[in-house]
């Protein structure tokens, strides 16, 4: 039995008083002080971990101003505040103690657009890709690019002055910020925009907080103008945080305070809104993927690409390429980056040309390609091949792979993981190759592996050395390498921070600014935040205050992780290896990962949040001397002793009375998971939440009773076959209002599905497929076996959507094969989802033995529901290991593709069909939609894939009363719009859950693709 974890770091009374008074004064946002909420805000995309005291989620600038006004009261003068956006920073920019002000949950509105003047006004929590999706119909985009664009907020981009691919032409975020609305500590609203210097000087004479700010910045930047120009490196990725260089324009006629705030990392004010310059979308885009025999060759050849007037040149090394090959993303780009015969590709330059004149762009591209052919023929520059991508869709897939590179590096095998700490250095592009040669020599001298990729056109290369931060010696080495890289970048006239901000690396600021200019930064900080209460420890302390800076060797995630025994870390890899990349925060409703995060906007309910909580739970168990691996081994095979039952009942009673246990907070996060498994493939680290969720639930319920519904769900495969013998009787009973009311109130289940009428057994009466014995199957000759298909049943389709199975049997017959309906054998997936892992292992072993016996017959076995079929491949393998055997159950599309291989494609005509894939299917098997389309094409039918996220049902998730609202909300995110837009009778869904959700919400259902094929053939 797991122990009660009754102690968690508390929240000081002053913070609680502040939050209470904040709500009393009309704060309309959310506040959070639970340990779970604070833990999710204690990490970002960096190696650091710092626990805040509380989190607030304002809904408006007025809410932020209220926070700032109350904070200025003397009684709260010791509290500190840190703004936070998407939490994608790689250097701990938004990590701090005190109160986190999260702008991402609610402040995500696009306020107005002026296409004629080319600007848009947004709130700070708007996500970069969200904005570009909005701008696309207007023919514009927000140009600064970054790899985390589908979850990074514009407020975060402004605060770090982010940039990425294309910056040589498009510049940094600060080049596109026309003005911001910021809230100062005290509640004053500061609106910035470029001003004539005379007006700025006049504003500086006002005896107000804003006046003092204008005066300080104006005077310091004017008086130290020459020193600033002399000391700021002449780089595309210029020195920011604080950008003294660009406050005045070159002619000294214009003053813009915006430049101080961009890159300020929340140390000066809360940026709540921004007016942004938007760029017309180029009409023509071409990508040339140039392949090299070494990474050094790719680096040294990059200037040649820039001279060819390319928009951007992105470089990827062999380590990243090889990791991409092992990821789901490679499926989308493999045809665009093919191997060169008899050559090893060790480097890749992704060269983009863009513009409005197609003839001019093609002329530049063709000239480059001719020159590349000459280099290949003469064996020069290490060029071994190239491929052009003329279509926008192909180019976007290439960039999606490149964007995923950061996360892919985190999936490297072994305890040492490539980590960020010196990953965005910038040097003059002409020195990049030599600089990287020295950088590599430095890492090689320590015997480290590393991955490299980046923006070689701008002289920025992302370098991530692999270190095990659970090893104290390697943690020390990280600081040593940081110091060496600082010296190396200085040697080449570069910067340590090319695009990701300073964060915990701000301790190196004096080395780059010089002591004299660093003193000027402190004066600016003092004008905005004299008492060092906004994100203290970052950028610089205010003048006149001897305050410490954050350090590169501050407390890290590894400091906490190393407290968990190595064996436990290895066995709970899914939770331990999350590196915080945050892809699970993807805003796009059509992306399968992560539905619970999308509907709640609560990061506890994301793979990253769940992994964070489980790591802490494992650490707290270790702190109490409890080994979860030993507990798992000691679990009884079956049954529970009376003593244990009494103890669980007592513990559950105390829990219901409000007795604290951190395990309850973890349980709450796990209960929100739909177990769709999208994270197990979509996440670059392959964080499989359903796997460690099941293990957690199993251990949690050693201490606490399970709800009745868990037992009912886990035994559905036992009672469904019995109920199906009299489906009308049971349906009548289930449909009674009293039964439904009792089910919702006492069991916690709603909208219970009805059994199929007629049942599958009734539909198959007299059909040969249901009446063949094992002996008859074994007696078939080779020719007969080649034409026989074994249909594997699952509990949901066979008993609740039996027509699908019956139609598949008929389809197999129509195609000239002999279908045989195998006896039903429980799959066990429901047991796995609910954490009945011992029972699941028994179920899996029994069914695996049966299917292995069938497999020896040498006939294909096929199932129609993706989630259940894929359970045989994934969960069975984890539970049984080698005892699983070699059996293989095919999905319907896999078998059809093989069976129809020799059949020619017919002329496609008529109305389209529309394919809605199951989350588990399309993420685990990304080629499934195309495979289904190819199958339909063989019969002259067109099948279009509909891009949607999760339907919200996910097995029994949508039937649980506590999930009902979220289940319907998830459906509304993407499925409902598609169903309203498309003809229902032409919509097809492979998942039983998906079809039942459509029927529940829309009133009428959709069919399985095999049913449409049967109709087409008829």
Task: List where the protein language model places each region.
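Terminal amphipathic helices with adjacent charged low-complexity linkers/tails
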Residues: 274, 308-416, 454, 599-600, ...
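C-terminal substrate-binding/cap subdomain adjacent to the FAD-binding core in PCMH-type
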Residues: 157-159, 167-170, 177-400, 511, ...
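Iron-sulfur cluster-binding electron-transfer modules in prokaryotic oxidoreductases
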Residues: 529, 536, 690-1018
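Ferredoxin-type iron-sulfur electron-transfer modules in oxidoreductases and energy-metabolism complexes
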Residues: 550-581, 585-723, 841-847, 885, ...
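N-terminal glycine-rich flavin-associated loop
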Residues: 46-77, 81, 99, 103-148, ...
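N-terminal flexible segment immediately upstream of the FAD-binding catalytic core
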Residues: 1-72, 76, 86-118, 147, ...
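A glycine-rich phosphate-binding loop feature that marks nucleotide/adenosyl-phosphate handling sites
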Residues: 88-90, 148-155, 239-247, 314-331, ...
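Flexible inter-domain linker/hinge segments
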Residues: 2-5, 203-248, 254, 524, ...
């Amino acid at each position: 039995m797991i122990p009660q974890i009754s102690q968690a770091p508390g929240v000081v009374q002053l913070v609680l008083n502040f939050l209470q008074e904040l709500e009393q004064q009309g704060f309309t946002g959310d506040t959070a002080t639970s340990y779970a909420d604070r833990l999710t805000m204690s990490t970002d995309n960096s190696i650091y971990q710092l626990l805040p005291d509380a989190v607030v989620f304002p809904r408006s600038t007025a809410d932020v101003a209220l926070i700032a006004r109350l904070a200025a009261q003397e009684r709260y003068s010791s509290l500190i505040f840190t703004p936070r956006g998407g939490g994608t920073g790689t250097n701990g920019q938004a990590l701090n103690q005190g109160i986190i002000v999260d702008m991402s949950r609610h402040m995500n509105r696009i306020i107005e657009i002026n296409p004629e003047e080319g600007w848009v006004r947004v709130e700070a929590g708007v996500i970069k890709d969200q904005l570009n999706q909005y701008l696309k119909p207007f023919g514009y985009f927000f140009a600064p690019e970054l790899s985390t664009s589908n979850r990074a907020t514009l407020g975060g981009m402004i605060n770090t002055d982010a940039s990425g691919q294309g910056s040589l032409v498009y510049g940094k975020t600060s080049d596109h910020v026309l003005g911001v609305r910021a809230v100062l500590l005290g509640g004053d609203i500061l609106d910035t925009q470029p001003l004539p210097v005379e007006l700025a000087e006049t504003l500086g004479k006002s005896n107000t907080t804003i006046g003092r700010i204008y005066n300080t910045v104006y005077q310091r930047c004017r008086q130290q103008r020459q020193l600033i120009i002399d000391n700021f490196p002449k780089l595309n990725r210029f020195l920011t945080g604080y950008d003294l260089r660009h406050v005045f324009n070159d002619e000294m006629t214009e003053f813009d305070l915006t430049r101080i705030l961009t890159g300020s990392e929340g140390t000066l004010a809360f940026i709540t809104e921004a007016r942004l310059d938007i760029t017309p979308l180029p009409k023509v885009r071409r990508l040339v993927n140039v392949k090299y025999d070494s990474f050094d060759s790719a680096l040294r050849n990059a200037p040649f690409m820039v001279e060819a007037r390319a928009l951007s040149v992105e470089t990827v090394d062999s380590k990243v390429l090889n990791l991409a090959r092992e990821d789901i993303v490679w499926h989308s780009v493999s045809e665009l980056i093919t191997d060169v015969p008899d050559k090893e590709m060790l480097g890749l330059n992704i060269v983009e040309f863009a513009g409005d004149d197609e003839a001019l762009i093609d002329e530049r591209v063709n000239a480059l390609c001719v020159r590349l052919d000459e280099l290949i023929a003469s064996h020069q520059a290490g060029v071994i091949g190239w491929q052009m991508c003329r279509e926008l869709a192909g180019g976007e897939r290439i960039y999606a792979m490149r964007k995923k590179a950061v996360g892919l590096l985190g999936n490297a095998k072994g305890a040492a993981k490539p980590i960020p700490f010196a990953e965005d250095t910038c040097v003059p592009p002409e020195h990049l190759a030599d600089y990287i040669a020295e950088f590599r020599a430095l890492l090689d001298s320590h015997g480290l592996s590393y991955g490299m990729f980046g923006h070689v056109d701008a002289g920025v290369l992302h370098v991530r050395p692999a270190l095990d931060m659970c090893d104290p010696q390697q943690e020390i080495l990280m600081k040593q390498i940081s110091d060496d890289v600082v010296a190396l970048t200085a040697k080449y006239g570069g910067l340590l921070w090319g695009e990701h901000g300073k964060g915990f690396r701000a301790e190196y600021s004096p080395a780059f600014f010089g002591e004299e200019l660093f003193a000027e930064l402190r004066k600016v900080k003092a004008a905005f935040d004299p008492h060092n209460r906004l994100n203290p420890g970052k950028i610089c302390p205010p003048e006149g205050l001897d305050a410490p800076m954050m350090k590169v060797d501050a407390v890290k995630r590894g400091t906490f992780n190393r407290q968990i025994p190595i064996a436990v870390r290895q066995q709970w890899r899914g939770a331990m290896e999350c590196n915080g990349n945050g892809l699970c925060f993807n805003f796009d409703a059509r992306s399968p990962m992560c539905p619970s995060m999308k509907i709640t906007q609560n990061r506890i309910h994301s793979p990253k949040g769940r992994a964070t909580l489980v790591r802490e739970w494992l650490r707290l168990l270790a702190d109490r001397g409890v080994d979860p691996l030993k507990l798992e081994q000691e679990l009884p095979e079956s049954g529970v002793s009376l003593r244990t039952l009494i103890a669980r009942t007592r513990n559950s009673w105390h829990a219901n009375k409000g007795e604290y246990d951190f395990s309850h907070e973890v349980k709450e996060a796990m209960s929100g998971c739909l177990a769709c498994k999208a994270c197990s493939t979509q996440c670059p680290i392959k964080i499989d939440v359903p796997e460690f969720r099941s293990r957690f639930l199993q251990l949690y319920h050693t201490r606490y009773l399970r709800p009745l519904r868990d037992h009912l769900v886990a035994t559905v495969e036992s009672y469904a076959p019995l109920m199906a013998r009299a489906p009308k009787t049971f349906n009548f009973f289930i449909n009674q209002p009293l039964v439904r009311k009792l089910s919702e109130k006492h069991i916690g289940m709603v909208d219970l599905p009805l059994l199929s009428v007629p049942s599958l057994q009734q539909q198959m009466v007299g059909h040969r497929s249901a009446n063949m014995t094992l002996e008859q199957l074994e007696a078939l000759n080779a020719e007969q076996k080649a034409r026989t298909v074994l249909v594997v049943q699952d509990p949901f389709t066979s008993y609740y959507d039996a027509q699908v199975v019956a139609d598949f049997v008929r389809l197999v017959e129509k195609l000239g094969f002999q279908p045989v309906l195998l006896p039903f054998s429980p799959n066990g997936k429901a047991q796995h989802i609910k954490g009945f892992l011992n029972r699941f292992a028994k179920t899996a072993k029994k069914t695996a033995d049966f299917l292995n016996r069938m497999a020896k017959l040498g006939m294909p076995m096929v199932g129609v529901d993706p989630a259940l079929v894929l359970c045989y491949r994934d969960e069975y393998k984890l539970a049984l290991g080698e005892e699983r055997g070699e059996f293989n159950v095919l999905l319907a599309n896999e078998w059809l593709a093989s069976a129809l291989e020799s059949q020619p494609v017919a002329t496609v005509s008529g109305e389209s069909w529309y394919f809605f894939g199951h989350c588990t299917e399309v993420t685990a098997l990304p080629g499934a939609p195309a495979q289904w389309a190819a199958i339909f094409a063989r019969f002259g039918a067109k099948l279009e894939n509909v891009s949607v996220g999760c339907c919200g049902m996910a097995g029994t998730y949508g039937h649980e009363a506590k999930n009902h609202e979220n289940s319907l909300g998830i459906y509304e995110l993407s499925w409902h719009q598609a169903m309203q837009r498309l003809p229902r009778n032409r919509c097809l869904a492979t998942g039983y859950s998906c079809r039942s959700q459509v029927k529940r919400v829309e009133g009428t259902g959709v069919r399985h693709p095999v049913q449409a094929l049967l109709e087409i053939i008829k």
